[in-house]
Amino acid sequence: MVREDLRNIAIIAHVDHGKTTLVNEMLKQGGTFRDNQVVQDRVMDSGDLERERGITILAKNTSTTYNGVKINIVDTPGHADFGGEVERVLKMVDGVLLLVDAAEGPMPQTRFVLEKALAQDLTVIIVINKVDRPDARLDEVVDEVLELMLDLGASDEQLDAPVVFCSARQGAASFSPHQFGNDLKPLFDTILEHIAPPEGDENAPLGMLVSSVDYSSFVGRIGVGKITAGTIKQNMQVTVCDYHNPDLKTSGKITALYQYDGLKKSPVDSATVGDIVAFSGIESITIGNTICDPAAIIPIPFVKISEPTIEMTFSVNDSPFAGKEGKFVTSRQIRDRLYRELLKDVSLHVKDCLLYTSPSPRD
């Protein structure tokens, strides 16, 4: 079964090269929003810290439609500290848009995310963004990207990647570096032509890899992943297994099933091969688990989650300004908030510890 009505892509880039702005424009031109609807900038960055810093921290799922084809889009973080998010979500897609600033060219994180995409043999579409910058180096940057792909061992097919020139802020794209487009039609056409549609057997036993998790105070832990085989249905009994931990086998029931529809998660009764879905009902679910048919337990291989890159210690605030700023200022409240974050961020480690402070000479 080939899903010609579906494409799954991720947008990868160095921080501040315009990923989230491009997703905004793709959603607008794909008809996700009404003509009279006011759309805020960086609509995908929903977290307070993401909006404050102007960066993407957690990978986000959304979708739009072009010429009757649904395009599932994953907006990934561009900062090196959140590289683990990029590694995981690449398992859900069949191709990537590699976004590169027309003036800055490939940057350190560009190399990191591109290496991960090439290692998984994903189709790459090169998007040169911010072509309207006065210091843009269009031809040079294209050469730099191709040289980087060559250094990373890209195959001949990957080196033949199409190039689209784009201004995400103006919502315009073109195949020529010297001709400015009016909309993103060249980019959409390139996605449909070069990104392969998902394939699989919808009648086979269910197989789905959990690549991301979320948490809701209403339904509990939510797993997100792409169906690689079979069909998943609401109220279906499933078995959870893990490739790196073969002894782990638990049973569960899919109590709610959702697909991404623009910025919303819309409830559905069933989904099949190639669909990216979110589900609830299994509280122990975590990234790397396989959801499968109890009659055919086959774990799907998955990359191990990267270890944290930063370590922080929280201790009692003995500043003269202690307790005068912020809403939640006690150590118990901070601890509770960190443990709540563990429910949806499995790359985070939290440990309780006892800090001993030696007495001062006055004591």
Question: Can you annotate each of these PLM segments?
Answer:
Residues 165, 300-316, 349-352:
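Flexible hinge/switch segments at interdomain interfaces of large molecular machines
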